[in-house]
């Protein structure tokens, strides 16, 4: 058996087309164009690439996009002031603060400064709390995108044993809550977990978001399991690989996401989806 690929690139492209269509309809109706402000502090190369992709996505779907490229020595006070101004700007529906920030800045305080109804990344404690209470509003983009990928397989998630490898605030923890909402029995593993292979081997669905290339071996995967690889790691030879050993997981899994072209495009598409939702449902 060879796993079927979950083509995140194609699914994300379809979602962007739907968003662009809705933006065009809004214009025809005389409604405001959704607006996204993207803040980049410093010159981290990976962050610059991510931000350029997000700005390109905005142009593709017809969003108003405002770019703020700030020097690495920007102060906490100055950055907080910019966020406050964007919070008050009626043309802006979403405020995105690109992470990581320079070490002298307190990311937690700054993320909490973004108004929850403009927190299109879904990182604010208010939005994470709503997800935990089973009344999600703006959902964290990567877990939200993964749920869309899972829906594309047609699999019935109710009662599935799901394992999330990694317990970060951005992916692992909200992912577990999304899977609980979907009816899965969820185990979250982390750096202190004993017998990771045993947990993975019992799972019908594995979501790996640890940021460690090749952490999950293909032979650990249960026959027919769904494997979602969130990791994206650049090797010395420039090749991008995930947290799962793809070549050995492929013959065992039922469905699997490639790296690249799996989860990453969906994260970006869900950022646009959240921004459109904020414009239509929260700021109309």
From Swiss-Prot:
Gene3D superfamilies: Leucine Dehydrogenase, chain A, domain 1, NAD(P)-binding Rossmann-like Domain. GO terms for cellular component: cytosol. Its EC number is 1.5.1.5, 3.5.4.9. It catalyses: (6R)-5,10-methylene-5,6,7,8-tetrahydrofolate + NADP(+) = (6R)-5,10-methenyltetrahydrofolate + NADPH; (6R)-5,10-methenyltetrahydrofolate + H2O = (6R)-10-formyltetrahydrofolate + H(+). Pathway: One-carbon metabolism; tetrahydrofolate interconversion. Keywords: Amino-acid biosynthesis, Histidine biosynthesis, Hydrolase, Methionine biosynthesis, Multifunctional enzyme, NADP, One-carbon metabolism, Oxidoreductase, Purine biosynthesis. GO terms for molecular function: methenyltetrahydrofolate cyclohydrolase activity; methylenetetrahydrofolate dehydrogenase (NADP+) activity. GO terms for biological process: L-histidine biosynthetic process; methionine biosynthetic process; purine nucleotide biosynthetic process; tetrahydrofolate interconversion. It holds the Pfam family THF_DHG_CYH. NADP(+) binds at residues 166-168, 232. It comes from the Bacteria. Catalyzes the oxidation of 5,10-methylenetetrahydrofolate to 5,10-methenyltetrahydrofolate and then the hydrolysis of 5,10-methenyltetrahydrofolate to 10-formyltetrahydrofolate. Homodimer. Belongs to the tetrahydrofolate dehydrogenase/cyclohydrolase family. HAMAP family: THF_DHG_CYH. This is Bifunctional protein FolD. The gene is folD.
């Amino acid at each position: 058996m060879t796993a079927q690929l979950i083509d995140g690139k194609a699914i994300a492209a379809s979602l962007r087309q739907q968003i662009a269509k809705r933006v065009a309809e809004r214009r025809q109706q005389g409604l405001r164009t959704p607006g996204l402000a993207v803040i980049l502090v410093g010159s981290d190369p990976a962050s610059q690439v991510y931000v350029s992709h997000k700005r390109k996505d905005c142009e593709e779907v017809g969003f108003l996009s405002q770019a703020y490229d700030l020097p690495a020595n920007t102060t906490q006070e100055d950055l907080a002031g910019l966020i406050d101004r964007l919070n008050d700007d009626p043309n802006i529906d979403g405020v995105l603060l690109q992470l990581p920030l320079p070490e002298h800045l307190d990311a937690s305080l700054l993320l909490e400064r973004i108004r929850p109804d403009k927190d299109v990344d879904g990182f604010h404690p208010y939005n994470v709390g709503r997800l935990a209470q089973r009344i999600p509003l703006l959902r964290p983009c990567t877990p939200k995108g993964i749920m869309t990928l899972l829906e594309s397989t047609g699999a019935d998630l109710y009662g599935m044993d799901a394992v999330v490898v990694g317990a970060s605030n951005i992916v692992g923890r909200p992912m577990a809550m999304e899977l609980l909402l979907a009816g899965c029995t969820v185990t979250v593993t982390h750096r202190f977990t004993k017998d990771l292979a045993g947990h993975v081997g019992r799972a019908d669905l594995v979501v790996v978001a640890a940021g460690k290339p090749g952490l999950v071996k293909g032979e650990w995967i249960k026959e027919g399991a769904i494997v979602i690889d969130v990791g994206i790691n650049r090797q010395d030879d420039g090749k991008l690989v995930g947290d799962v050993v793809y070549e050995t997981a492929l013959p065992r899994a039922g469905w699997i996401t490639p790296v690249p072209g799996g989860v990453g495009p969906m994260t970006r598409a869900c950022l646009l989806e959240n921004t459109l939702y904020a414009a239509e449902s929260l700021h109309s």
